[in-house]
């Protein structure tokens, strides 16, 4: 787990642990050790929302049964946009290792760009018709996709309201 979490904050995390807490030790507290002060742990209350969410996703991928489907709403919520690559790499790596299908939602153009063109067959977007009904569309079936891609990235298409 630490190898996936290590690049997240400005100061590298070198170890992640959890310990039982509470009167009857029925709860757990998460701790991270960072390179800048390796003797002083940072508990979950001192971690950013993005770091906690990233760790939760790693734990979910490591503990879900193989051949499962893991749905993650707003996968990058709270995570700094500069960490999109680490998130995408972790999702691809752990889902492949654990044989888990991952379905994620996002509104982040940086994350879409990090997925890259090879992932186009796996990207969908949602539109609404004149009645307000939502429709899920495969990006690879988008009319004039090649022309849109020639003028920018997947994230740029989203920002420009083309998908």
Indicate residue ranges for each PLM-predicted region:
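Bergerat-fold GHKL/Histidine-kinase-like ATPase
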Residues: 3-6, 14
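Residue-level preference for the first positions of well-ordered beta-strands
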Residues: 67-69, 101
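Conserved ABC ATPase signature
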Residues: 10, 14-62, 69-81
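Glycine/serine-rich loop-strand microenvironments at binding/catalytic pocket rims
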Residues: 4, 69, 95-96
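Generic hydrophobic alpha-helical scaffold/packing signal
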Residues: 2, 44-48, 56-58, 76, ...
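C-terminal lobe/lid and adjacent interdomain/linker elements of RecA-like ASCE P-loop ATPase modules
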Residues: 86-163
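Residues at helix C-cap/C′ positions in short coil/turn segments immediately following an alpha-helix
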Residues: 9-12, 65, 98, 119
């Amino acid at each position: 787990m630490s190898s996936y979490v290590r690049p997240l904050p400005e100061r590298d995390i070198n170890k992640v642990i959890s310990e039982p807490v509470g009167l009857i030790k029925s709860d757990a507290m998460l701790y991270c050790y960072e390179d800048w002060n390796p003797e002083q742990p940072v508990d979950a209350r001192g971690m950013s929302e993005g770091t906690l969410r990233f760790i939760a996703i790693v734990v979910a991928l490591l503990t879900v049964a193989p051949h499962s489907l893991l749905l993650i709403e707003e996968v990058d919520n709270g995570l700094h946009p500069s960490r999109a690559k680490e998130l995408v790499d972790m999702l691809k790596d752990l889902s492949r290792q654990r044989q888990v299908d991952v379905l994620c939602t996002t509104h982040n153009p940086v994350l879409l760009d990090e997925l890259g063109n090879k992932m186009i067959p796996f990207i969908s977007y949602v539109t609404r018709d004149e009645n307000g009904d939502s429709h899920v569309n495969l990006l690879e079936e988008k009319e004039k996709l090649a022309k849109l891609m020639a003028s920018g990235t997947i994230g740029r298409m989203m920002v420009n309201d083309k998908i």
